[in-house]
Amino acid sequence: VKDTYGGTNVIFSEFLHRFNIDVTLCDTTDHAQIESEIAKGCDLVYLESPTNPTTKVVNIATLVHAAHQAHAVVVVDNTFATPINQNPLSLGADLVLHSATKFLGGHADALGGVICGQKALIDQIYHYREINGATLHPMAAYLLLRGMKTLDLRIRQQNESAMKIASYLEKHPAIEQVFYPGLSSHSGHEIASEQMRGFGGMLSFMLKENSFDAVRQFVPRMKFAHAAANLGAVETTIGPPATPSHVECTPEQRAAMGIPEGLIRYSTGIENTADLIHDLQQALSIF
C-alpha cells in the first residue's frame, strides 16, 4: 500500500527498484484495487494498519485470503496497533513488524525493531541478520524488556485517553476532521471494531485552517504535548507529518497519500486525560 509510514514508502518507491524488485503501490482503502493487483501475481503483500499518520484501516483477513490464493507472503506493520490491540498473525498474516522504539519500549529511550511470524520465514531472516549484523545492543534490549513489563497498562490508558480526545476534537469548531478508528465517523471503524480489541493511542486531526502556517502557530502553544518525531511513549507527542513521519516525501507525495498540510499527528501519552484535553483547548483558542 502507498499510504504507509514515510520511510517505508521511500524504500518501496525508490530503493527496491535498484534491486530489480517491481513494486505496485495501492490505496490502503481501495481493497478492490489491491485484490486486483494481487490477482495479477505477486510474491509479497505489505500492509500497515492503522496507517501512519491518517489511521486508515485495512481488512487484514480479506487481503490475506486474496494474497494466499496468489501464493504471496503477507507482511503487516502493526506498530500503531501494538500486540495488545491487534494480532495480525491470528488473522492469517505470515509476518508482523513492530518498531519497538515506539509503543513496545514506551519510553523513547531505545531503538529497536521486532519481526515475528512463521518459523520457516523467521529462520531465513535470522540467517540474513547474522550476516548483515543487525543485532540489538544489550542496553537497548534491557530497556525494551523493561518497557514491555508495563505495555498492557500503558496501552489501556492510551486507548482510553485517545478515544476521549478524538471525541473532543471532533466537536471543536477549529477542527475540520479527526482521524481515529474508534470514532463511528471513521471510514474504517467497522473493520477496526472487528479486528482490533482497542483503537490505539494514535490519532491525527486536520485544522480547519488547512495550512502549514496554521500548524506552526498551533504546535508551539502545546504545554503537555512535546513536539517530537517519536510516538508511542508515556509522554504525549505532537507534530505535522511533514516533519516527523513523512519528511522524506515532497508535499505532492504527501498529498497523493491523503496527507494535507494542515494535518497534525497526535501520540497520546499516559498523562491525565483532562489535562491533555485542557491543553488542546488552550492551544486551539487562537483560531
Q: Can you name each region flagged by the protein language model?
A:
Residues 1-174, 179:
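Conserved PLP-enzyme active-site core in the AAT-like
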Residues 8, 121, 165, 210-214, ...:
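Short phosphate-engaging motifs
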Residues 144-153, 200-209, 265-269:
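Short, well-ordered beta-strand elements within core beta-sheets of diverse protein domains
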Residues 106, 138, 195-198, 256-261:
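Short, flexible turn/loop "capping" segments at secondary-structure junctions
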Residues 4, 13, 22-24, 36, ...:
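PLP-dependent enzyme catalytic core of the Aspartate aminotransferase-like
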Residues 163-234, 249-255:
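Conserved small-domain helix->loop->beta segment predominantly found in fold-type I
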